[in-house]
């Protein structure tokens, strides 16, 4: 492995706060309440002051012919890049204007996202136009967001210019090439006071069931949801790191770069294509981190199926998954995928409790529920006919009409959930099928540019509530 490491220098300050303590984010009743002034940018600044020489993000580049090349950035170096890129953004975009990231997976994407937030603009995490099969989604998101500026890299600039060239001149944004911005640009950066209720970024929905829409995710929602995940998955050990190949424009991928900001650790990133071509790369990266402490990763159901089938390692491979926690979600979870993965990798130290079936939606920033840390994945079976009648009736696994459903655990702390009849808006009793309604500080502010849909989805109130038992 060719390792490229840049060395930064941390500068401590006695009047600056230390690393965030999770207990400082809980009130007297144990509810998640962000302390004043806490947001992604202030957390990054804490890390710069306290662990500036520590690695913040590592990217495993598999595009070269000589094997994997690891590129790292420390917290101090990241801070330098954020000021420089932020200054470049401030020259072309004002506070509250949208800045779209159209860049390939990598550290420049990470820096671009955080720089847009630091500059006081609204980040719009998208992807380079060269990504195949997503042209319509990009065009829809771009038309909705109407960004003032675009962040990209030198390698993707050609495809970005081609894409922007097809837009009407009145809609063509300024372009900032992130990896060509000199560090010295940071001298021109103007600090911005971040309002916790302001929009941090627009998270576009997947578009799997409807055209993609941009969820307005506030700074409070981001911070709250990260704390909720840390508490639910029991990631309280500071010696916890992340590994992810998920696209950074995906809400689950974006969360994987948020974790390190909270606890001062680091995340190791891969490109989605690197995983798809050789899924064992994911396992190898997890194993490397597992040797040094706890490691958390997240992926959709198909990834576990794909890795169990195509990510097999030779018996002599030195792989240790003892300290790995794996979130599975983002699409319907199947017990067959979990079982296949467990059978393949439990001999490598994977705990029976390691895989955490979870549920989340972009409207809730990401995370809604997961199973308890000490609980293995479980499945229940419902009667197919009864489900069509909006009734959840348990049956035996061998019942001819049995429909398996993997349990996604408990609702996160300081998030409230009820099941509602969508027609009457009345809360339903146990055993009923209805809409999931959520409430909490992690819920987004609305859909960007869609006031009617926002009123329908984000301001609805139940017409009647069940009596608490």
Say what each PLM segment does.
Residues 1-73, 77-90:
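N-lobe entry segment of adenylate-forming
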Residues 53-110, 114, 131-139, 191-193, ...:
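Conserved AMP-binding/adenylate-forming core of the ANL superfamily
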Residues 152-159, 179, 274, 291-343, ...:
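Adenylate-forming
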Residues 52-55, 176-177, 183-204, 210-211, ...:
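Conserved pre-ATP/AMP-binding loop-to-beta segment of ANL
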Residues 2-6, 91, 119-185, 293, ...:
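Structural core segment of the AMP-binding/adenylate-forming
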Residues 223-241, 250-295, 310:
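Conserved AMP-binding/adenylation subdomain of ANL enzymes
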Residues 114-125, 144, 250, 261-263:
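Short hydrophobic alpha-helices that are characteristic scaffold elements of the AMP-binding
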Residues 324, 333-469:
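Conserved AMP-binding/adenylate-forming
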